[in-house]
Amino acid sequence: IDNVVQQIVPADSPDEAFKKEYVKERNIGIVFSGGPAPGGHNVIAGLFDAMKTASPSSRLYGFILGPDGILEDDYMEITQRMVDHHRNYGSFSMIKTGRTKIDSKAKMALALENCKKLNLDALVIVGGDDSNTNAAFLAQEFHKDGIQVIGVPKTIDGDIQVKDKNGNVLCAVSFGFHSAARAFASDISNLSNDGNSDVKYWHICKVMGRVASHLGLEVALQVHPNIFLIGEEMADYIDSARIEKAKKEGTVDYTAYGMTLRHVSRMICDGIVRRAAVGKNYGIIVIPEGVLEFINEIQVFIIKLNTIIAEYNQTHDLDFHSAFPTLEDKLDYLRRLVRLSREDKTFSTWNTRDDDLFNDLPAFFQEGLLTERDSHGNFQFSQVETEKVLMGLVQDYLKILKNRGDYKVGIKPDWYRKTLAKAGLNPDAFGPVLFKNYGSGAPCLLVKSSIVSNKTLKQELVRGGQIGNTEDIPAAIQKVYQTSVPKFKTQNHFYGYDGRGSDPTWFDCTYTYNLGHTVFSLIANKATGQMAAIKNLEKDFSQWEPIGIPIAPLMHLEERKGKLELVLERSIVDTNSPAYNVVKALQNEWLSATTGPDNYRNPGPIRFEGKNINVRPLTLTLNNLGRSKLTDS
């Protein structure tokens, strides 16, 4: 298909042939594919309204439960009443969705047969990277039969972003992203209010995003969490000290590139310890769902296990997970691969080093890495307790720091003086014995590192001449010490499915309705193999431009089920983007490791009118400002 980017503009003086073609009666099919995203119903509404305006006798058919509806000839005609009932309404409940792929000759033939039964002029596929990939192949297959295929970019992950060869943005973000991010941000903001109230929990918030950290970045901008992780930052990390050391030794240290799990856990610990030192033993941590994929040793495991599982499934009648139902069964199979490789002296995907490192992981994490892949062969990060993996390492290291005396809760000087005065004790006599920074004017007092137990506390008091060997520790001093001992408590939260089903924001409502209109314009102008898009989303609505983007050039080779396949390339967070740089610049400010108030931001509820309707994603706004400054300079 000879495809180029289609610019959709009003026809000033259309000829009769164009008018006739535009307003002719059409049968159009539409299908949702993959996970739900807010705004899908407005795609249907926009397409329906545009189609009926052009020709009231045209029909729109919705395939039920995703691509299965196409294969099983399960559909319904979409009516005005149905459309009106679902306008601006979240989820994909009107026609449901599914994850089946039309990825074989037999399925393609069946899909074509069922589309021809309905006498379809066009098929619209609303979905993510895999679904739009499917749309490109279907467009090629259906072309000779005159059935057009148009894709619509849908995913709350925000990882469908398209630029032309000159770097100009054609599609800034997929629909559903803004609504999901705002839904998550609203909930996490409530947690910051809660944390600020009972001051005893660290809330660990895992945010959906299978690969890219776009949602995590947007949520961070919306709520200002104390600690947040961006997976792409970890992949780009270079340990210069390790590289220099290796150079001097005449070797290459490959572990210097990218962060290790241990390094990530230490970063989190550093923020927790710094906040505790100023009396804040609570906070908010935002972790993208797919963050582990950017950690070197985990990525290696995922790639190798994907290959092993795919190869097994291709050569055996029983699939891998049915053949090895328990964790021990799976581990035993991996051990056999290593043993056979040693005995036969052959290359194996899984080697002794892999097996040793894998066996060092907690059992629940091993289970997670060996979990069944989705229908596209993707590793299901939402099924892995990412936060449990990281926080387990964090808790282990915090125990070490606590025993070393480096993890303490800061004591307010006024509270200390009041507590001792109430007990009839002299604060200035005990202060230099208890605290390493007493009299320094510091906003919080820190108990000496040598005091890590009641026994060591008594030893310091005896050594400082405040009590005798046979005397008990005064109750007030005991109270001060216990207050300084950190109790690290966490509450885990996962934000994903709730955001997929939330009602769309004004931005997504408007975006998706116009995508529906764009779809019809592409169909009416005989386009196929195109993805409907809107340019200039970061600008005022009056500057939005509907376009069609050819899907085929957006694809690249990617490993799926152990084989290289052509799929739509997903966009990850650009660590040089203005939005990312803003977050990095404010990281220390958001940590709020001071005695002053925390820097949490409350985005407020989703609104459709008024001064603060939060009209578009903050990442889009900041990136546009950055580009504008570059252009001006």
Feature locations, PLM:
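N-terminal phosphate-binding or glycine-rich loops at protein starts, especially the Walker A/P-loop
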Residues: 17-71
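Short glycine/serine/threonine-rich phosphate/pyrophosphate-binding segments
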Residues: 37-47, 70-71, 103-109, 128-137, ...
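Phosphate-binding loop/pocket of nucleotide- and phosphate-handling active sites
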Residues: 468-485, 538-633
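Short glycine-rich or small-residue beta-strand-to-loop segments that form or flank ligand, phosphate
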Residues: 27-37, 93-98, 121-127, 202-207, ...
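Accessory alpha-helical/coil subdomains and C-terminal extensions
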Residues: 125-127, 133-137, 141-142, 146-150, ...
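Glycine-rich oxoanion-binding loops at beta->alpha junctions
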Residues: 1-21, 70-121, 166-168, 172-189
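Short, ordered loop/turn segments at secondary-structure junctions
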Residues: 33-35, 63-69, 99-100, 128-129, ...
